[in-house]
Amino acid sequence: MGVPVVADSWHSFPHTSILPEEPTMFAGPPIGAVCPFAGQVAPISSSVNTIWSNTPCASSGEAAGTNAEAPISYVEAQGWMLCDGRYLRAAVYPELYAVLGGLYGERNSTADLEFRIPDYRGLFLRGFDAGGGMDPDAKRRLDPTGNNVANVVGSLQCDALQVHAHPYEITTPAGISQQGNAAGTSISSKSTGSPENPARTALETRPKNVAVNYLIKFR
């Protein structure tokens, strides 16, 4: 068996490779990989995220998604599906079950074991700290089902404001009184000034964002 001849753009002459076969650098994303998708997928899920209802930070006023004026992508034909918290049969999706197991929940409602995929609709994703020291509340995270405290991949964390303090001024009246009629004094108060820019208020604290679909690789 001869050694293959390989030409590249860096040299004008062919050269022989020292490898019997050229290595494959990228074989594609692994099963269980999650990626943002800018297009519209079908079907659009309208079910409520029930995982967060188990937590103290459940939201209300949910609204079902609507179709945008854009093409619809049927991503499941390409091995991807929307991260919408659905249950799948382990016998039908053995590769994905081998990755997720019962991490996000499982049940035996039918003759076959079913496992749940993560539900990332309307959520921001954060890298698992894994001892990196960047998540000061890591020990208070909730497990992927929202039922118990657990610092694991897939765990949940409620929205919050960092603990802080604000100084403020107090006017303390003082005076000397003598025998005679009672004297009175008034206490002045101060308030914070108006913000330089009109403040934006909403039902949650959030950064600027763009809505995307999070997809998970199942085959």
Curated annotation (Swiss-Prot):
Residues 174-201 are annotated as: Disordered. The keyword Membrane does not apply. Residues 174-195 have a biased composition (Polar residues). It comes from the Bacteria. This is Protein RhiB. Keywords: Plasmid. It comes from Rhizobium leguminosarum bv. viciae. May be involved in plant-microbe interaction. The keyword Iron-sulfur does not apply.
